[in-house]
């Protein structure tokens, strides 16, 4: 297994969990409704889109009653969790595959929810931590790192300063383009020497690990609106 195996080869028509569509449909993970709640009933394509987008944007920018440290504590408690030989078996993949969000991203990217069970899971890990802590409206949820980052950018919570609890997006090429994102995790701290300490899923040999990364590999940061 290659180091930092973050993008798996998928057969044509399968979920593009790491290579997915470029449609900015991912605002759906900011919904105020409880986890896995159904989207509003259709009231007409244009009106539904307007209402849903407005509600999602408001939710994504509403402060949650969760601190950055609480999110990092839950993420840290997962260190050592490992995938199986098929690239699956984690609770993060199992949770995502059965979530309402999986149905939404399947509609966007194609495939079937069961394909998430063995798909690249770094973004699913971040999403799971958000769900477990009650910070999901701020952390977002997706299986595709590029769309996850676009959601932060669309909600004006995207920047270049590392902060504890921020969601950090990487490109191994050093690109600063969201389209080139390969990986995602949480910032633990800025080390002040051109590196950041992080907690990431699906890194190394498919594990949750604490890492130190050069900021030259960072595309940008998503900023959840945590409780102070």
Residue ranges: model-predicted function:
Residues 2-41, 157, 178-228:
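Aromatic- and glycine-rich peptidoglycan recognition patches
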Residues 3-7, 11, 25-28, 127, ...:
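Activation targets extended, charge/polar-rich intrinsically disordered C-terminal tails
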Residues 28-55, 60:
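C-terminal region of N-terminal signal peptides and the immediate post-cleavage residues
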Residues 47-131:
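N-terminal capping segments
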Residues 69-76, 149-153, 219:
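Generic detector of well-ordered alpha-helical segments enriched in charged/polar residues
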Residues 78-85, 163, 195, 210-212:
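Extracytoplasmic low-complexity repetitive segments enriched in small/polar residues
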Residues 126-129, 168, 187, 208:
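Hydrophobic aliphatic residue packing
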Residues 136-204:
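...with weaker cross-activation on analogous glycine-rich loops/strands in unrelated enzymes
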């Amino acid at each position: 297994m290659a180091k930092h195996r973050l993008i798996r080869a998928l057969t044509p028509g399968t979920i593009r969990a790491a290579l997915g569509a470029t449609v900015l449909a991912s605002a759906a993970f900011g919904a105020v409704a409880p986890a896995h709640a159904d989207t509003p009933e259709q009231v007409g394509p244009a009106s539904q889109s307007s209402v849903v987008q407005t509600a999602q944007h408001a939710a994504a920018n509403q402060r949650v009653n969760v601190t950055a440290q609480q999110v990092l504590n839950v993420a840290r408690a997962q260190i050592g969790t490992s995938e199986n030989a098929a690239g699956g078996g984690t609770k993060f993949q199992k949770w995502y595959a059965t979530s309402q969000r999986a149905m939404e991203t399947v509609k966007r990217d194609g495939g079937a929810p069961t394909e998430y069970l063995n798909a690249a899971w770094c973004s699913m890990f971040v999403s799971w931590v958000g769900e477990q802590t009650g910070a999901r409206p701020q952390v977002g949820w997706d299986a595709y790192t590029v769309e996850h980052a676009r959601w932060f950018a669309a909600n004006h919570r995207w920047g270049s300063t590392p902060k504890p609890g921020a969601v950090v997006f990487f490109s191994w090429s050093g690109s600063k383009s969201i389209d080139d994102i390969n990986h995602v995790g949480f910032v633990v701290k800025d080390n002040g020497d051109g590196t950041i300490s992080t907690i990431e899923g699906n890194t190394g040999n498919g594990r949750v690990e604490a890492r130190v990364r050069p900021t030259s590999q960072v595309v940008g940061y998503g900023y959840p609106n945590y409780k102070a």
